Amino acid sequence: MEQQPSVPRSCTNVARETPMNLNIQSTTGTRYELSVPPDETVDGLKRRISQRLKVPKERLTLLHRETRLSSGKLQDLGISDGSRLTLLPSVEAGLMSQMSRPEQSVMQALESLTETQVNDFLSGRSPLTLALRVGDHMMFVQLQLAAQQSGASHLQHRHVITRGAEAGASPQYRTLHTSTSALSHLASCTPGSTPPTTLSPTASTHRDGPHSSPLTTSVFRSHGEGVAVSPCAEQVPCSSRGTEGTSSSASSRSRKPGAIIESFVNHAPGVFSGTFSGTLHPHCQDSAGRPRRDIGTILQILNDLLSATRHYQGMPPSLTTLRCHTQCASQARNPKATSPQSSEPQQTTHPVGHCQAQTRTCKPSGDRLRQTENRATRCKVERLQLLMHQKRLRRKARRDSRAPYHWMPTRKSSRTSSNSSTSSGEGSLEIDFEDSLWKPDVKAELNSEFVVA
């Protein structure tokens, strides 16, 4: 007798977990059914409808029994299984809708993504392409997160952790399979011919802080890992950069959530590419430290990347400059890794001298670009100074025109400044109009009428 009440309880639990079927009917005649969980909210229902209709959810209006649904849970509003909802289209016209669309373009694009697209992007299987319009400019942004690495890359990552621990970093790291600490980059290259000893012995990896943990599936890369990136097509081994001071400062910064732009390449006018690394914010992670598979995680990554542009120091190098530095670093590192300890010093100094010669050839391009920008800035400053000087002269002429004229030098200077400021054809401020307009035999009482003109 005591087991009978447990049967309806299990039935009610199953009934609560079963989704509700809602009949959506629009005013244009479209009808379809939509299955939602029992604890679905109005905002979530609008998001599901917007994903199906490819319409922003801000332009959707739902009615239930002639009552507009704005917020709250569906069960609290009296909506149950089999309820009928009316969908009203929101029509906008004029310039107001065009001005408000750019502010909501990113959020609308993220909300239109399906769960499969979000999972593929966060796991690194597919890139995320966004078309943004700022004023009259159209920008195409493509983000690619590196996929989860395994095998040799896992061993390589573990070797970096070991060498970083020998350099004095904290030994508390997370493995690659549970929650990675070495978060990978956009274009990763695998050094196949170089031994593991060519990696930087002073590279320190990410420390696990109490409030932040790195993103799973290698979405970002560790702040302290000082490894430069080279394209895989060139087959150039990854070169190490950074010293003990920079690695220790980077490891201290890596505890804070956020992103850091590590490389930035200018391929052509208006075409840029680069790599970034960082740590995901704690509110985008679940209780196990894994990232949440929703658009909030993508939005947080975009915000971190945008805020990282303010802290990015240095001018974006060109593609040839980056390749030159990569080749120089690889040539300077290979003799040290292959030559024995008793090798002659001439063999190690020759590639370094060759590297310096290559860097000298790479410097003029950056210096020429810097000189061009300095010249353009100087021209702008001189133009602004000229405009300010002309404005100052016009203000002085306007002020002198309303003042009484008791002295001859004041009257002559005011007329000269007014004539020089109003003349637009000459463009010179040193023209003397006294010889053509002023005659010494004219009386001063008659001049007071046409001096101001």
UniProtKB/Swiss-Prot annotation:
Keywords: Cytoplasm, Nucleus. GO terms for cellular component: cytosol; nucleolus. It comes from the Eukaryota. Residues 365-374 have a biased composition (Basic and acidic residues). Residues 20-94 form the Ubiquitin-like domain. Residues 330-362 have a biased composition (Polar residues). This is Midnolin. It comes from Xenopus tropicalis.
